[in-house]
Each structure stands twice: as structure tokens, then as C-alpha cells.
Design a protein with these regions (language model features):
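FIC/Doc superfamily catalytic core
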Residues: 1-197
């Protein structure tokens, strides 16, 4: 497996554009799992390398992961490796697509694509109020958007972002603005789980 991880790193550094693009998509997808404290499996890395090398498609990678976890179910309810692997593969596939529309419906669709079969509420706006203790805030409790106003709040934030002009902004200003927009989406917390996509 370490050879596959080295191969994965090599692809990011020295391959042709198509392989490099897939490599970055997989690297990003795996990294996003780590942000949520999830660890992907060695099997996922092996599958990713096969996809990057052109041996299998994203659809085949997803099918292989599905079969792998049907044959090797988690023995511990706390083990979220299957979730990490499946979501990482779906993120890599989404990042490799060229079509995208910046709308609340697309946002809901992305959640549905990533979490179908993992969360029963995949792609659906939550219909209940929540508070959560967040590790990123040292366990402080966060109040999220009210369930009755989630759709309207989401549409408002997207419409405000669409109006914003990035013209003549420095990279630091762009990063700051995007961070504020993303933090607003997280504060809305439109889904019961899976909001940090």
C-alpha cells in the first residue's frame, strides 16, 4: 500500500494533465475527509490510483467500493471509514465534472450525490432546529439557522454572492470573502449532517 501512496504522490507531481487533474481531485477529496476527522482506507488509495491511471472510471471506482464494503462490513459502529471512502470517491468524481451551476438547488444536489446511502436525509433541507458542540470551537455550542427559514436564508446568501464582484480584488481579499460566504453556509447548517462539503 505504501507503494500505491508513493505512486499517488508521484502522479500529482509528474504526470500528464488528465492524470494530474484526477490526482488533484482525489487528493482534495481525501483531504476533505480528514477535515471532518475521517480517515480513508488503503483500499480507497489503491482504487484512486487505478482511476487516475485510466484503468477504471469513476463509476467503476464507486462500484468497486460498494462491493468491497458489502463484502467487508464495518465491525464497529464508530468506524466511519466506509463513509469516508464513498464520499471521497463521489467528491473526486464531482470535481472532475465540468458542468456546474451556482444555485441552492445545485448545492442540495451535490449533498444528495455525496451522501445518498449514507444519510437518509441526503440532499434534503432539515426540518428541525439544532445546536451542536463543535470541536473547531473547543466544544462551544453553536446555534444554527432556524428550520422554518432555511430555504429562504440559503437563497438569500446565494443571491448576495452572485451579485458580488471579485474584479480588482487581491488574492487575500478573495480568500477572505469566500471564507465569509462559506462560514455563512455553515452557520445556516441546512443539512442535518454533511454540511462541510
Amino acid at each position: 500500500i505504501q507503494d500505491e501512496q508513493r505512486s499517488f504522490q508521484r502522479i500529482l507531481l509528474e504526470s500528464e494533465p488528465d492524470k494530474r487533474d484526477k490526482g488533484y481531485a482525489w487528493h482534495t477529496a481525501i483531504g476533505l475527509q480528514a477535515v471532518d476527522g475521517l480517515k480513508t482506507s488503503d483500499y480507497l488509495v489503491h482504487t484512486a490510483v487505478r482511476n487516475i491511471e485510466g484503468e477504471i472510471s469513476f463509476e467503476e471506482a464507486n462500484a468497486l467500493l460498494q462491493t468491497y464494503y458489502e463484502e467487508n462490513p464495518a465491525r464497529d459502529a464508530e468506524d466511519r471509514t466506509e463513509e469516508a471512502d464513498k464520499v471521497a470517491a463521489r467528491i473526486a468524481a464531482l470535481l472532475s465534472e465540468r458542468a456546474f451551476s451556482f444555485t441552492p438547488n445545485e448545492y442540495l444536489s451535490i449533498h444528495r450525490k455525496l451522501f445518498t446511502g449514507i444519510y437518509p436525509h441526503a440532499g434534503r433541507i432539515r426540518d428541525y432546529n439544532i445546536t451542536k458542540k463543535e470541536w473547531v470551537l473547543n466544544g462551544a455550542t453553536v446555534l444554527y439557522g432556524s428550520a422554518t427559514e432555511l430555504r429562504a436564508t440559503l437563497e438569500y446568501d446565494f443571491s448576495e454572492e452572485k451579485k458580488f464582484s471579485y474584479k480588482n480584488l487581491s488574492m487575500d481579499e478573495i480568500i477572505h470573502h469566500l471564507a465569509v460566504f462559506i462560514s455563512r453556509l455553515w452557520q445556516i447548517h441546512v443539512f442535518g449532517e454533511g454540511n462541510t462539503i
